Amino acid sequence: MSKITTIGLDLAKHVFHVVCCDGRGKLVSKRMLKRRQVLTFFAALPPCRIGMEACAGAHYWARQLQARGHEVILIPAQYVKAYVRGNKNDYNDALAISEAVSCPQMRCVGVKTPEQQDLQALHRLRERCVQMRTGLCNQIRGLVGEYGLVCPKGVAILRRQIPVWLEDGENGLSELFRRLLSQSYAQLQSLDAHIAFYTEELERQGRQNTVCQRLQTIPGFGPIAASVFYSQVGNGQAYRRGRDAAAAIGLVPRQHSSGAKQTLLGISKRGDRYLRSLLVHGARAVVSRAAGKRDRLSLWINRLRERRGFNRTVVALANKLARIGWAVLARNTAYQAQRAA
């Protein structure tokens, strides 16, 4: 039997499909495994390259297989699709993965550590609660508007106004609607408590985690931005340079070029929208406070703002902050502001 060098593993909840290929890419064997058989099967194999789609559970299986001596490559699902031939089935998917993982130019996803996944879970839960609170506030505004009651923008103002509406017996609210509004107010308070818990936990992790502490030496990086950047980028080894990290976050121009004509459009906005928004918010704060400062970064910001305006400067700085963040992670050092010569 030919030596197995590359394996395509199609992940699932209960039934996994494996395609084994030799060094020339020729199919050696294929089989179906139940969940309890996966680790036993790979433990009996010599070290080889295993490709998987970067989907649910991929980071767990990648860590387990790496611990057994294998090289694991996680590939975005959209890149695997180009290699699928024939009908859609799990064996064809696994074969496509084995071919994609053999491409030298394939863009891969870094394997997350449990610590990174913990931070990511914190951010996802907090983000969900924030979205739920925003939706609830908008719904409350719409409902009370049908009774002739309006409120200025802002969660804090609405939070103060609801008790006033409930206590006012002359505003035309029915008894039933008062009970509904009171229930919605209790739900809003519960969401506030959940968001406060997640925010406090993120800030605590930012203070205790040494990597997050280094990231917070960068202008525009607070505990929340530092923790989400670390959870997504890891140690930075998944990218060759800072520009690649910024491109993965979607902070580089989208290109539509042909021949000798180079056309650059707005930023691509690919990758994680949540991380990109935090970098832009942090950059906006830095740009707003750069006037009068004499370090090299602030001077660059002020010159660019004069030429290109505020918003373009914010996005350009967000790109630069992503590159600086990658350098801090990849070189295991803290950011040091440089004075102008």
Predicted regions span which residues?
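A detector of single, family-specific signature residues
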Residues: M1-A341
